[in-house]
């Protein structure tokens, strides 16, 4: 697999109009919405995060969590909230990078033609569990932005677990599968792990990783 990145790929103008999104199928809305949530969460915990990017990411997490379910049901409010949320997430992560969830998702999409947002959504809870030991103290703010009830009264471990549970629930609510069963082939895991480790997003992950550890993450998603 070859990654192609060039400044000529970046548009000079982007028209973000929720009315133009009203014909999107539910599955596409769910997948792209969960990709946007992954942008915001990974951008918030990445090694390169800063005060300004944190501001964008937390607001994006709030907007996406509040509006993705409605967008999947094609409500005008949901579409508008998601249009704004995904745009704000892009303003954040494009300045600080992403992490292991995206690096693992890229290979899946290339090898199996799995929609990128679906791959991100399935891997995100696993990535959060993996990164909890080094970035778990930041999960409380993510959970708070997602509207997790009682999170201020929880200790850090409880808040992290509640945040991961909220991510899983949102993904399930919009129809995303919970694992890679039927998608991932065990014989491809070595290749995928090597590709993920070499991916441009991998160095931004808050926890340093290895090909062997990524292999175990893939295996856990079967």
What are these regions (language model features)?
Residues 34, 61, 101, 120-121, ...:
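A general structural signal for well-ordered alpha-helical segments in protein cores
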Residues 47-56, 70-81, 96-101, 153-157, ...:
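Flexible, glycine/charged-enriched surface loops at secondary-structure junctions
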Residues 1-96:
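Carboxylate- and glycine-rich phosphate/diphosphate-binding segment that chelates Mg2+/Mn2+
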Residues 139, 149-222:
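C-terminal charged capping/lid subdomain of soluble metabolic enzymes
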Residues 96-162, 168:
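C-terminal catalytic subdomain
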Residues 37-41, 82-90, 104, 124, ...:
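Short alpha-helical scaffolding segments that buttress acidic/His motifs in well-ordered protein cores
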Residues 22-24, 43-48, 67, 71, ...:
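Alpha-helix C-capping/helix-to-loop hinge sites
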């Amino acid at each position: 697999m070859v990654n192609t990145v060039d400044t000529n790929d970046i548009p000079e103008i982007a028209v973000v109009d929720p009315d133009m999104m009203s014909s999107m199928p539910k599955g596409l809305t769910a997948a792209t919405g969960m990709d946007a949530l992954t942008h915001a969460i990974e951008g918030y915990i990445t090694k390169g995060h800063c005060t300004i990017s944190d501001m964008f990411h937390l607001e994006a997490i709030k907007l996406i969590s509040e509006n993705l379910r409605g967008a999947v049901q094609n409500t005008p409010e949901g579409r508008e909230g998601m249009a704004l949320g995904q745009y704000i997430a892009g303003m954040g992560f494009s300045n600080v990078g992403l992490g292991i969830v995206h690096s693992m998702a890229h290979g899946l999409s290339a090898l199996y033609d799995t929609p990128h947002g679906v791959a991100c959504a399935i891997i995100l809870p696993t990535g959060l569990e993996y990164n909890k030991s080094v970035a778990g103290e930041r999960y409380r703010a993510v959970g708070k932005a997602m509207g997790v009830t009682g999170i201020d009264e929880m200790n850090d471990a409880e808040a992290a677990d509640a945040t991961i549970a909220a991510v899983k629930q949102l993904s399930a609510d919009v129809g995303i599968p919970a694992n890679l069963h039927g998608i991932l082939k065990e014989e491809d895991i070595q290749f995928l792990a090597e590709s993920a480790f070499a991916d441009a997003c991998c160095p931004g992950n808050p926890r340093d990783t290895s090909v062997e550890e990524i292999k175990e993450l893939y295996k856990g998603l079967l």
